[in-house]
Amino acid sequence: MPKYKPRHPGGMTIVTTPSMAPMAKQAHEILESKIKKKSIGYAEIKYDSFSRCEVLPIIQGNVRGKHVYLFLDFNGNDWMRDMFVSQLTISAIQDAGADKITLVIPTFPGQRQDRKDRSRVPISAKVVIQALTNFETVVHVITLDMHAEQLEAVFPRAPDHLPGFVIFAPWILETFHDRMDQVVIVCPDAGSVKRNQRLAKRVNVPLCFLEKNRKGRGDNDVIAIHGADVEGKICIVNDDLLDTSGTMAKSGVTLLDHGASEIHLTGTHPVFGGDAYETLAQTGHPVVVTDSLATREHDWLTVLPLAPYLAEAILQNNIEDGSVSSLILNGLPT
């Protein structure tokens, strides 16, 4: 283990919103176990509510002079309210004397609105990123599997952007270790090909993608399969966002019609909008996601923890010659 070398004399502190506390606590424990004899602070944020929907963030710990790693989430049903509360939280930490703030945000809202696809509309993802990073003490961001890589250019400084394959590749290798010759990675649409090429290369299996006839937002029919043959294969359909999941369900039907022996539906960010739970349950296929967003428990749903990866990213930012790229290239150290 390289020598621990904090970026500034004040050391670092993990601060978390209530719903991110389980992930933040686990990350804190991992960091404490790896950085021997070095105390890493931990504090949670309490939110008091008042009339007219006013919210007051209260930091339950000392952050003065610290480099704060702030775990933020957008688990609520009203992400625009979550945005404002997040800004209040960042402001409170800054005003409490934090030296620097790194935002740890597994997923941002508004990511699918990443470009102007018609006139007189905003690039919402850009607005969200700028609103969260436009603070003097916010110096860095750690995030996961953004919908479009070009969003990295919006940040004041390039974020530590962990791709989804870093999490899903170990799961695939562990789950199908004795059947890897039967595995095919499936792109549910052409837009996910680049992302899944990396996953397929990491686990050394073939790739195919489904061509869709797009009728409207969230309404698509699969019309063709291109690439690897899926007959008799274990098909792992992978995407970054699982929202209403209608396309995922249709993908499963198409793959079965083409002779797939087994289907697993996977996605980094479980948005699960509308009737997604019912839609996915009715497919009869196992579903695997990360805990970037809160989910309900179901027998068919497996949730992979992000804490080890986020902890490693934080660690690599605080050791001599640390490199988050090594985490992306090689996975978690054994």
Sequence positions of predicted segments:
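PRPP-associated nucleotide enzymes
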Residues: 1-334
